[in-house]
């Protein structure tokens, strides 16, 4: 379920352009994934519980131009992230392409504000300074002021390009053990 932005094995309704998570387990991916000879999809159950899976794959057998980019995705986890260490979202990407988006399943281990980590994009040989440097995670995701609305609460939202669609909590702001799912797509960048 990580591929369809359902971190923590808990549903979080989401209405975006490439991914939709709908009521009662509807998880839909609309990413274009061209292939020239064959394609393989693998599902892995990381629990000891049996799962019932229903799926539909829509494809067409057409010629794919030589300059058509492939779809690549990376998954990795740091639990917990070392203090003051940068969390790398995409590593060692080479060649021509477009970065299309980020999904973060974020767990909080302290009673402090967790979203001030700036998002940095080191591109095209950047070393010391990134081409893009943001002001905080909540700003990168499309929110502001710690996603607080109404006062004293986090606010779920889901838009075509960004959202904080999962809030798994003890109640209130800045509480340890809260978990969040959030995304940002760069489809028009």
Ranges and model annotations:
Residues 1-189:
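Beta-strand-centric surfaces of beta-sandwich/beta-rich domains
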């Amino acid at each position: 379920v990580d591929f369809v932005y359902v971190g923590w094995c808990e549903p979080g309704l989401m209405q975006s352009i490439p991914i939709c998570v709908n009521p009662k387990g509807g998880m839909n991916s609309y990413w274009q994934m061209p292939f020239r000879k064959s394609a393989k999809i693998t599902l892995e159950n990381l629990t000891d519980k049996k799962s019932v899976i229903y799926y539909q794959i829509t494809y067409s057998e057409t010629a794919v131009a030589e300059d058509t980019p492939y779809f690549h995705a990376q998954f990795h986890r740091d639990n917990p992230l070392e203090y003051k260490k940068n969390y790398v979202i995409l590593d060692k990407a080479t060649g021509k392409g477009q970065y299309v988006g980020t999904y973060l399943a974020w767990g909080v281990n302290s009673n402090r504000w967790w979203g001030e980590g700036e998002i940095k994009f080191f591109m095209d040989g950047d070393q010391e300074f990134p081409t893009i440097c943001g002001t905080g995670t909540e700003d990168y995701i499309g929110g502001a002021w710690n996603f607080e609305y109404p006062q004293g609460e986090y606010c779920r939202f889901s838009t075509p390009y960004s959202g904080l669609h999962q809030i798994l909590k003890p109640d209130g702001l800045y509480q340890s053990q809260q978990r969040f799912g959030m995304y940002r797509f760069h489809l028009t960048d």
